[in-house]
Curated annotation (Swiss-Prot):
Modification type Proline amide: residues: P32
Primary localization class, coarse: secreted
Lineage: Eukaryota, Metazoa, Chordata, Craniata, Vertebrata
UniProt name for this protein: Calcitonin
Recorded family membership: Belongs to the calcitonin family.
Record InterPro entries: Calcitonin, Calcitonin_CS, Calcitonin_peptide-like
Taxonomic source organism: Bos taurus
Top-rank taxon: Eukaryota
GO cellular component terms attached to this protein's record: extracellular region
UniProt-recorded Gene Ontology molecular function terms: hormone activity
């Protein structure tokens, strides 16, 4: 990772996206 804050934000967004997907609603960009 070149930028720590970007790294953390990316990981956080991924978790957030997974959380919403499990909750039954899409959130954020689609990830494979």
């Amino acid at each position: 990772c070149s930028n720590l804050s970007t790294c953390v934000l990316s990981a956080y967004w991924k978790d957030l996206n997974n959380y919403h997907r499990f909750s039954g609603m899409g959130f954020g960009p689609e990830t494979p």
